Regions:
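Feature captures the catalytic ectodomains and active-site-proximal regions of enzymes
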Residues: 1-225
Length: 225
């Protein structure tokens, strides 16, 4: 499967970036799709939650728990390609800027410009910077209190949030794929993500949730000296 997919990427990946954003084929298409949703929304408010490092199979685990904790939650799912190399600093900045990586060479190796890029994107769509909110480093604590410290309900139109709990679990994992699924399940059962989504919906936001990249089990080379 990996061999076939690699061959497909060589032939087709370069053509994905210029496809229309109606059904986002790549992560930098996502904000432009949000613009369309905002225009069609009764409240004119959108919220984007980026779960750092969440793989597709782990999303299945997350989805099942979200639906169990909130039986009224309605979801639509689609698949989107990350940017290669699938690094946080590359793909996540593409998400928040709405642009391919070639447009942010000076910050390609870090994520400190995400908030600025997110604000610039929405200013380009006619919003004031006061209508835009961004916060990263989420995943623990009281989701409602955290959200209320970031946004002004009824005023903030575009919300960008980074949940990095799964990425932290991944970088500390020593028990492989099974350990990842188990810890992600335990974290989800704590209810942070469910509360975050529910409160955004209660405030009238259309909520999108995506990952910037996934993760895969591999054999390392030990701890370098």
């Amino acid at each position: 499967l990996n061999t076939a997919f690699a061959a497909w990427l060589v032939d087709h990946y370069s053509s994905l970036m210029n496809l229309p954003p109606t059904n986002p084929a790549m992560l930098h298409h996502v904000p432009r799709r949000l613009v369309r949703d905002m225009e069609d929304s009764a409240n004119g408010q959108v919220a984007l939650i980026v779960v750092d490092g969440l793989s597709l199979d782990q999303w299945v685990t997350v989805r099942q728990i979200l639906q169990k904790q909130n039986v009224h939650l309605m979801m639509r799912e689609s698949a989107t390609f990350a940017w290669i190399p699938t690094l946080t600093s590359v793909s996540r900045q593409s998400i928040f800027s709405g642009k391919p990586p070639l447009y942010f060479p000076s910050s390609i190796n870090c994520t400190n410009s995400e908030g600025k890029l997110w604000t610039q994107f929405w200013e380009g769509q006619g919003l004031s910077r006061l209508d835009v909110a961004y916060q990263r480093g989420l995943g623990d604590g009281d989701a409602i209190d955290i959200l209320d410290s970031v946004i002004h309900p009824g005023k903030t139109k575009a919300v960008g949030l980074v949940v990095d709990k799964i990425d932290k679990i991944m970088h500390g994992m020593q028990l492989g794929s099974a350990g990842m699924h188990n810890q992600i399940k335990q974290w989800c059962q704590g209810g942070f993500l469910t509360s975050l989504v529910a409160q955004l919906l209660a405030y009238g936001y259309d909520v999108w949730l995506t990952a910037d990249h996934g993760n895969i089990q591999c054999n390392g080379k030990g701890r370098p000296l």
